[in-house]
């Protein structure tokens, strides 16, 4: 059995794919399985991936499917994974050569079924290291985790036992997957090194804002419903309320303000405020918001209906 299975969804990334795959083939960890999932690419990505499989049959599996989006490709790759742990890597990103060895060893040393590392935002003209919040328990993790799939090592059995998968057809797939995963983690660990290079490029899904930005509403509602169905909503209510407010007042607000169509932009901004205050009318009394002094919280404490409109207008022009 491989120690780690790495799932790489591929869609029209011929310019970046070789660097990504080469970084995986250079891993110092032995017994690694690399699963390349061609999600209906229309460029030369499929041929590039096939060639890697041909020359590395002991480590590389190439599969292809009709285009279904990032979530669908990851779920498809999970069917072929046989490793003790699962990792995900986007096909335009790359990873330091000792990443999975360090993360796997940390998992074994601490008997952890979930391991995180730091990562590097890589812009055309600069880089920035993103360090994890030093949370001490799962409640803190739920509030402050970086909701990305690719800086994590996850016990495969944890995913199987809890029937976890990425939501097909939705943006913010990492939000839903990560928040559904956290309650089932038995022990988590952290490697204080920035192993992942998160490459920023124009035209990527993460940098395109349109009416699909509204899918954050569906994802957040899916998460809340999941916690209720599993009878853990009351246990994590403060964290879920905090996240609901944080997304709609911070990260998603920024994205909505960058939508070029004015009618769509204003509709979503109004809906965002109304949803927050309908689902969590007392969100300003949230214990995490009131007691944790980080920048976002200081800003959120000042928000009311009037200042929300002012902040929105400012974000539209900066």
PLM region spans:
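Membrane-interface aromatic/basic loop that binds lipid-linked glycans or pyrophosphate carriers
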Residues: 259-318
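Hydrophobic alpha-helical segments that form the core
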Residues: 244-250
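Short, hydrophobic secondary-structure boundary micro-motifs
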Residues: 129-131, 236, 285-286
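Catalytic core of nucleotide-sugar-dependent glycosyltransferases
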Residues: 195-201, 207-234, 250-280
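Nucleotide-sugar donor-binding/catalytic module of glycosyltransferases
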Residues: 1-221, 225
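Residue-level recognition of short, structured coil/turn motifs
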Residues: 57, 111, 186, 231-232, ...
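All-alpha amphipathic helical-bundle segments outside canonical DNA-binding/catalytic cores
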Residues: 233-243
